[in-house]
């Protein structure tokens, strides 16, 4: 099992996504969500995107997810 503080992204089909151990939401629109993680940034593109459930550690995103990309922190 993964350590509890390591960021984790789980995509379920084309319409649901679980983001664990995120730091903050940088940008939120119904077609684009940008999330700061410990080791980089996750960008989600699609349409009708909704942050369905949110806790201080976990986030569930629903909608039509078209693409997800990751920008790794460069040190």
What are these regions (language model features)?
Residues 1-75:
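N-terminal intrinsically disordered, cationic/polar leader segments
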């Amino acid at each position: 099992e993964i350590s509890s503080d390591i960021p984790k992204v789980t995509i379920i089909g084309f319409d649901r996504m679980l983001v664990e151990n995120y730091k903050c939401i940088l940008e939120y629109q119904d077609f684009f969500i940008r999330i700061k993680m410990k080791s980089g940034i996750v960008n989600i593109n699609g349409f009708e995107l909704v942050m369905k459930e949110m806790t201080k550690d976990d986030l569930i995103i629903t909608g039509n997810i078209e693409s997800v990309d990751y920008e790794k922190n460069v040190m």
